[in-house]
Regions:
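Flexible beta-alpha connector loops of hexameric P-loop NTPases
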Residues: 79-90, 127-130, 171
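Loop/turn-to-beta-strand initiation segments
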Residues: 114-118, 146-152
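Conserved alpha-helical scaffold flanking the Walker A/P-loop in AAA+ ATPase domains
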Residues: 14-18, 86-118, 140
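Catalytic P-loop NTPase motifs of RecA-like helicase/translocase cores
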Residues: 127-130, 145, 160-161
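AAA+/P-loop NTPase substrate/partner-engagement loops
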Residues: 58-82
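Conserved catalytic/switch belt of AAA+ P-loop NTPases
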Residues: 134-150
């Protein structure tokens, strides 16, 4: 079952050992970056606990479809991006979350279809909503769930969770994946061609969920082509055109927005910045290719945007080696600033002005 999970050897080994030895914990907390497989692992482990024999059998399919009677999942909802008490407990009536839809409505009933009930709480950071009321409401349950029940929480970091929740769970850590592993999975399991897989593996920054999402988004790949054309134009444009190029860059950015699972943190703010952050990531990969070509030469450089090889070879001499390295550093610095809530318009205008200045 869990062998389907890519690159999370320690996490999978811990869960498999606990299952085989019959030493299961009542409450688990899966912690790691978004898009690395926490939710997928939670669903597969839930299916295994409920009697599934393989990733393809009927039990597993029902779990992933959200129709299994003994597996329930909840995640933050509404403008506040929190998990309310009404989403958890049936005694709290709410127009938006009626009692019969509360995740824990069947907690004290024996499983109906298999040996276990499993409750998955995605983006458990949302339990801090309402001054932690929802999180506090399940502390006793997390500490001493019924023998037939297991909880699996996912989060991007323990720092964003109530300490009292973390202390009641066994923490399982998930990490970023090497690009080579993501590339292999995209080709072997999802039918990507090698050039496409190489680009997506590099751009996903270690997040297999993001890579798969991007592979399924042809409009995003088309947006990448427009972005690289804009980058090529920016490399040759006069400095006076910087503001116009920055505006084009921001207008293009929404085409590069991806839907990545396992998102955590302040999702509302993050989603507003995500398109520009994605565009900057793609721009960084492009300049990384130029730097590799400039430093190592065409015969030895491993190019991520291999399908744009001719364009790269024509553009590699526009900047000096030193300027290319400075350009990459600048892009990463601008991206980091926007992640920390810097003004995206001012930041991108500065970026394109500086890129023009580096050309000399």
């Amino acid at each position: 079952m869990l062998e389907e999970i890519v690159g999370q050897t320690n996490a999978v080994a811990t869960l498999e050992h606990a299952f085989q030895e019959g030493r299961l914990t009542g409450s688990y907390l899966f912690v790691g970056p978004d898009g690395v497989g926490k939710t997928t692992t939670a669903q597969l482990f839930a299916a295994k606990l409920c009697g599934a024999a393989s990733p393809d059998d009927a039990v597993t399919r029902r779990v992933f479809a959200g129709t299994h009677s003994d597996v329930r999942m909840v995640e933050p909802a509404g403008k506040s991006n929190t998990i309310s008490v009404a989403q958890l407990w049936p005694r709290s009536e709410s127009k938006d979350h009626p009692s019969e839809r509360a995740m824990l409505r069947d907690l004290h009933f024996e499983p109906m279809a298999g040996p276990k009930r499993v409750f998955i709480i995605r983006e458990a950071e949302g339990l801090r909503g309402g001054n932690g009321t929802s999180g506090n409401s399940i502390l006793k349950t997390l500490e001493e769930p019924p023998a037939y029940a297991h909880f699996i929480l996912t989060a991007s970091s323990t720092a964003a969770l109530l300490p009292t929740i973390v202390s009641r769970c066994q923490v399982i850590h998930f990490g970023l994946l090497p690009a080579s592993e993501i590339e292999t999975v995209l080709i072997a399991r999802h039918g990507a061609d090698p050039d496409q897989a190489r680009f997506l593996a590099a751009y996903s920054e270690g997040r297999i969920g993001r890579a798969i999402s991007l592979l399924r988004s042809p409009e995003l790949l088309a947006g990448r082509d427009e972005l690289l054309d804009l980058a090529d134009k920016a490399m040759r444009a006069p400095q006076i055109a910087s503001f116009k190029l920055a505006e084009e860059f921001r207008k293009l950015a929404p085409k590069l927005k991806s839907d990545v699972g396992d998102a955590g943190g302040d999702e509302k703010e993050r989603s507003a910045r995500e398109p520009v952050l994605n565009a900057l990531s793609m721009l960084a990969v492009y300049f990384r290719d130029l730097t590799a070509l400039r430093v190592m030469g065409a015969s030895r450089a491993v190019i991520v945007n291999a399908d744009r090889g001719e364009q790269l070879k024509k553009s590699v001499t526009v900047y000096s080696e030193e300027a290319l390295i400075k350009a990459m550093s600048l892009i990463f610095s601008i991206r980091q600033g926007i992640e920390r809530n810097a003004n995206a318009q001012l930041a991108t205008e500065l970026l394109f002005a500086e890129l023009a200045a580096l050309r000399g």
